[in-house]
Amino acid sequence: MGDVMANGLARRTLVALVENKPGVLARIASLFRRRGINIASLAVGASEQKHLSRMTFVAEGDPSTVGHIAKHLDKLIEVVEVSDITDANVVWRELAMVRVRATQESRPRVIQLANIFRVSIVDVGAEAVTMEITGDTAKIDSMITLMAEFGVEQVMRTGRVAMLRSALAPGGEDGEFGAETASNIQTREGLESGSV
């Protein structure tokens, strides 16, 4: 059914495969606007097919309207395929870049917190550091909240990207790797084939 927020609006996550040509995003945004649906998050990028792009939307709106948006998107000529993955078993991530004030006194603590959260420091200046945070929304929100005490100068977030989990992945059920990571699997497969 999707998330229903405190304000009564519903939130759905949609993934669309669309033709990679000018005006497609504008047509899709217009469709959302006409139906009174807010695009809370949007990520667009090249897909595995050269002439197609993949879009991930997080749409917010009236529950009766937002629940049907995938059907309306599917009617657009440029949309090859659309899926509502709100209730599906998916892996999703978001990326944020956050510039935080970091004086000589506060810098060690800022870096310590970044390490605890497995956050990358991608730029260091005289009075600030820029962090790259990848994860779910809760992780990013938590890190930004923690950094507020030092002074958050700028935040830039991507939209959510999502992909259906693989069925019956090694070491777990429905795409969960368990203790065996992808690099371990590649190393083991390389040893078995003699290519490592």
Describe the residue ranges of each PLM region:
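Long, contiguous binding/interaction regions
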Residues: 1-54, 58-196
